[in-house]
Amino acid sequence: MHMIRRAAGALAVFAVAALAAAPAWAATAQEQLDTFVATVKGATGSFKQSTVSPQGATQPAQSGTFAFQRPGKFKWAVQLPYEQLIVSDGKQVFQYDPDLAQVTVRQVDQAIGTSPAAILFGAGQLSQAFAVSALPDRDGLQWLRAKPRNADAGFSQVDIGLRDNQPARIELVDAFGQTTRVELSNLLPGAVPASEFQFTPPQGVDVVKM
């Protein structure tokens, strides 16, 4: 169970970052990414997430809400089947598991690494870290793929599907061959209050700094 929770936390970072990577479908995928990173500063929405192993085994589906604000701030709040909160204030990433009474704290750079989060939080050229390409349309969505150039990124690829110029689905294949699908809804671009990204560990919980 603890391993599943840790994996879910890492995938939450992937999902928020991949969301921020999805631009309006216009020119090339690279041009769209560059434009989106330069112009979209934040958004809120809802998600449903499921993970399937290479053998077809499924983990319990998750659902909740998210928010992000460039650069470096995000909130991923799992509501079902169990509560979990992941918050970045731009410097540190806090993962809070209420039923474990534990908060894990990591530096943003350590938590993000070379994941798709670099698309959201990074300030450099995307082409330095990712190979971005267009994919054929499917399921009524337009798709692009981002593949990390770093072999130690922890995932092999992330695909982003768009509808009506908004991200609707993210499909990430991790280093173990697991596929995580995140369905996005109620997406509302716009500034998010700084208070959304503030987190103080509740009194009495264990705080583990990584």
Swiss-Prot record:
GO biological process, one term: lipoprotein transport
Record localization: Periplasm
Residues annotated as signal peptide: 1-26
Main location: periplasm
Cellular component per GO, a single term: outer membrane-bounded periplasmic space
Alphabetized UniProt keyword annotations: Chaperone, Periplasm, Protein transport, Signal, Transport
Family annotation (Pfam families): LolA (PF03548)
SUPFAM superfamilies, per the entry: Prokaryotic lipoproteins and lipoprotein localization factors
Gene3D superfamilies in UniProt: Lipoprotein localisation LolA/LolB/LppX
PANTHER family in the record: OUTER-MEMBRANE LIPOPROTEIN CARRIER PROTEIN
Family: Belongs to the LolA family.
Subunit record text: Monomer.
Summary of the function given for this chain in its UniProt record: Participates in the translocation of lipoproteins from the inner membrane to the outer membrane. Only forms a complex with a lipoprotein if the residue after the N-terminal Cys is not an aspartate (The Asp acts as a targeting signal to indicate that the lipoprotein should stay in the inner membrane).
Full protein name: Outer-membrane lipoprotein carrier protein
